[in-house]
Amino acid sequence: MSSLPVMVLFGLSFPPVFFVLMVSLTLFFVVNRLLQPTGIYDFVWHPALFNSALFCCLFYLLFRYGL
């Protein structure tokens, strides 16, 4: 038996990790919008790889310590 219950919204069941993914995606877009004007992407070798790593780090932090 899982310690995290399945959440049901409008008759659709979602695993708890789905909501953590949605929150981390929202937080990623906010952080990405804050980083773009700073010019940090000029120093990044591969922006898509940087964005993927940033999302993975945010997801890990939220899943491990947050939600």
From Swiss-Prot:
Keyword Cell membrane annotated: yes
Transmembrane segments: 10-30, 43-63
Subcellular location: Cell membrane
Domain of life: Bacteria
Pfam families according to UniProt: DUF1656
InterPro entries: DUF1656
Protein family according to the UniProt entry: Belongs to the AaeX family.
Name of this chain's protein: Protein AaeX
